[in-house]
A protein has these predicted regions:
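Single conserved hydrophobic/aromatic residue that forms the stacking wall/gate
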Residues: 1-12
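Non-catalytic, C-terminal membrane-associated alpha-helical segments of glycosyltransferases
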Residues: 252-306
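A short, conserved alpha-helix in the catalytic core of glycosyltransferases
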Residues: 170, 176-181, 186-212
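Glycine-rich, basic loop-to-helix element that forms the pyrophosphate-binding segment
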Residues: 1, 71-91
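A conserved acidic beta->alpha catalytic loop
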Residues: 32, 47-56, 73, 103-104
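Short, acidic, metal-binding catalytic loop of nucleotide-sugar glycosyltransferases
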Residues: 31-40
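Conserved donor NDP-sugar-binding/catalytic core segment of glycosyltransferases
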Residues: 108-141
Length: 306
C-alpha cells in the first residue's frame, strides 16, 4: 500500500474507479489523478468486463500504484463499486476515495478532502466533492441532498451538511465501511450511491466540501427521468424505480408519499410527451411494484480479511 505525506501525518488512502467500455475516459481520469497535490493515491481499477481494450491500456500504463481487477462480467455500477470498495478496504487502506471513470478531479481535490478530514478529526460518515459539468456549471446529476427530498441549496462556506451524495468523488474511512457494510450490489445501477450515503448519514454527520472540485464529464447530463430520456435508455429505468422503493421506504410514511408522488409525476410527464406511453408507464410501475417485493441484503466486509 502506498503511503503519502499529507501535512505532518502519514496516511494510507486508496482510490476506487469503476469503468466499463470507456477506455479514453479512464485514461483522462488516471491522468488527472497523477496531478494531485496530495500525491498519487493507490489505485483500484474495477473493470466490468470491458471489451474496448481497457485491460490492454492498463497493462501499457504499468503504473506501480495501480491494481486492476476484471469482474468477468458487467456487474453494473453498484456491483463494481461494492467490489472495488471491498478490495480497497480489505487491503489496509485507511481512506477510500470513490469515483466514476468519467470524473476528472482538480489538482487539489484530494488535498481539500484530507484537510476537511483533519479539521473534523474524523468525526463524519463521508465527505463529498462539488461536481461540475465541463462548462463549469454545477452538474445537475450530482447535486447532493440536504434532506432525502431536497437538493443542497448552497455551496457556501468550508462545508455543508448533507444526507445523500453520488459516487462522483466520495471520500470515507475504511472504518466506516466496516461499520455500515458495502453498497448493495443487487441494485446493478442507479440509487446505489444514494442508498449507501443515506445509510451512513442516518447515524453520522456527513458533509459536502465545496473547495474539493471535480469535473464530471458524463455523456448524459440530464436529470434521471424516463419522460425525457432517449428510447435506448428506457429499459434500464426498471432499476431506478425499483431501487428507489428500497431507498425511500426507510424514511417511513413520508418516504412512501414522496415516492408515489414522484412516480405519479413522472407518469404525468410521460402522458404529456413522446411516443410509446404505455411502454414507459409499464416500466415505471412494474419497477415500483418490483421494489415493494425487493429486499436485498447488505453485505459486510469479510471477517477474515479485516
Amino acid at each position: 500500500i502506498a503511503q503519502c505525506l499529507v501535512g505532518s501525518e502519514m496516511c494510507i488512502r486508496d482510490r476506487v474507479i469503476v469503468t466499463y467500455n470507456r477506455k479514453a475516459m479512464l485514461q483522462r481520469c488516471l491522468r488527472a489523478l497523477c496531478t494531485q497535490t496530495a500525491g498519487v493515491p493507490e489505485l483500484w481499477v474495477v473493470d466490468n468486463a470491458s471489451t474496448d481494450g481497457t485491460a490492454e491500456l492498463v497493462a501499457q500504463l504499468n503504473l506501480p500504484t495501480m491494481h486492476y481487477y476484471n469482474t468477468g462480467k458487467n456487474l453494473g455500477g453498484a456491483g463494481g463499486f461494492a467490489c472495488g470498495i471491498q478490495q480497497a478496504a480489505c487491503s489496509g487502506a485507511e481512506y477510500l476515495w470513490i469515483m466514476d471513470d468519467d470524473c476528472l478531479p482538480e489538482p487539489d481535490a484530494l488535498q481539500q478532502l484530507l484537510q476537511a478530514d483533519a479539521e473534523l478529526d474524523g468525526q463524519y460518515g463521508w465527505l463529498s466533492s462539488r461536481a461540475l459539468a465541463p462548462d463549469g456549471k454545477d452538474q445537475p446529476m450530482n447535486l447532493q441532498r440536504s434532506t432525502p427530498y431536497k437538493d443542497l441549496a448552497s455551496f457556501a462556506g468550508p462545508r455543508q451538511p448533507a444526507v445523500m451524495a453520488s459516487f462522483v468523488s466520495l471520500f470515507l474511512r475504511s472504518s466506516t465501511v466496516q461499520r455500515f457494510g458495502l453498497p448493495i450490489a443487487e441494485f446493478f445501477i442507479w440509487s446505489d450511491d444514494w442508498e449507501y450515503t443515506r445509510r451512513i448519514s442516518r447515524s453520522m454527520p456527513c458533509y459536502v466540501i465545496p473547495a474539493s472540485r471535480v469535473v464530471h464529464a458524463m455523456q448524459n447530463a440530464t436529470v434521471v427521468n424516463i419522460a425525457t430520456d432517449t428510447p435506448d435508455r428506457w429499459p434500464r429505468y426498471r432499476y431506478f424505480y425499483r431501487n428507489d422503493v428500497v431507498l425511500y421506504r426507510r424514511e417511513g410514511l413520508r418516504g412512501w408519499l414522496w415516492l408515489i408522488a414522484k412516480d405519479a409525476w413522472h407518469s404525468v410527464q410521460v402522458l404529456r410527451r413522446g411516443p410509446q406511453k404505455c411502454e414507459r408507464l409499464g416500466i415505471i410501475w412494474r419497477g415500483f411494484f418490483a421494489g415493494v417485493n425487493f429486499h436485498p441484503t447488505v453485505q459486510g466486509l469479510p471477517t477474515q480479511e479485516r
